[in-house]
Amino acid sequence: MMKQEITIQIPEGLEARPVALLVQVASQYGSEIYVESDSKKVNAKSIMGMMTLGLFAGETVTVSADGEDEEEAIANIEKFLSSK
């Protein structure tokens, strides 16, 4: 299992379109991937779960992945969340 703290730099935060794109990125991997903010932890492959977090630019989340491609998964999710 691998964990990484990532600061969201997408200007509009995680609204519907960026969430859909993030779910597409996460769904490319076989690993179990979760995003955690405060006390909420949701499956990164779930649009509804991700929408419940209501994340904004500048917020920091913890992304965890467990599986054969966990390193690549976290690296690409970090790249996506850090894009401006």
Identify the meaning behind each predicted range.
Residues 7-57:
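Compact, glycine-rich, soluble single-domain proteins
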Residues 1-5, 60-62:
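Intrinsic-disorder/low-complexity, polar/charged segments enriched in Ser/Thr/Lys/Arg/Asp/Glu/Gln
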Residues 3-7, 20, 26, 76, ...:
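Generic alpha-helical hydrophobic packing signal
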Residues 51-84:
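C-terminal structural segments of small proteins and small subunits
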